[in-house]
Amino acid sequence: MNSPVRDDHWLLSRLDYLWTKHFSDVDQKNKVFIKFGRAAKYRFGSIRLDPKKDASLILINGMFKDEKVPVKVVDHTIAHELVHYTHGFSSPHKKQYSHPHKGGVIDKEMLQRGLGDLIKAYKSWLKDYRKSLKPVVRKRRSRRLIRIRWI
C-alpha cells in the first residue's frame, strides 16, 4: 500500500484535518501557512508571525518527511503549534499566558481537545528517538600554564 508523499501539500492536509476536527472553535484571524523546514535534532516545530504579510508560518522539522516518523508524531507537532496560535503566540489572537509553555498549558489544552492519543504516541516516540541519538563526547581542553613576566 502506497502512503502519500510527505511534502508541504501533505502537511497542509494534516493541518486542515486537525483544525477542522479539534480546533474548529478557533477563528483563523490571519493566513496560516505550513511547510517543512530544515532537519534538526531537537526542534520539531515552530510558529512565527510575519506582520508584513499578516500571516503565521508553521515550520515542521524536515526530518519528519521520513515515513519512519509516525504520522501521530507529525500531528502532535502541528497540534502543538496550533495551541500556540490559539493562545495568542505568533497569531493575532489575544495572548492568554505570559509564557507559551507555562505550567504545561500545551498538554492541558491538547487533552481538552481530545488529543491525548497524540501526546502518548509522541512521548513514546521521543523516548526511543532520544536513545537513538549518539551521546556527544567532549574532550576537556587541557589548561596551559601562562607565565606573566613583570618587567
Model-derived segments and their meaning:
Residues 1-75, 85-151:
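Active-site-proximal or metal-binding-adjacent scaffold patches in catalytic folds
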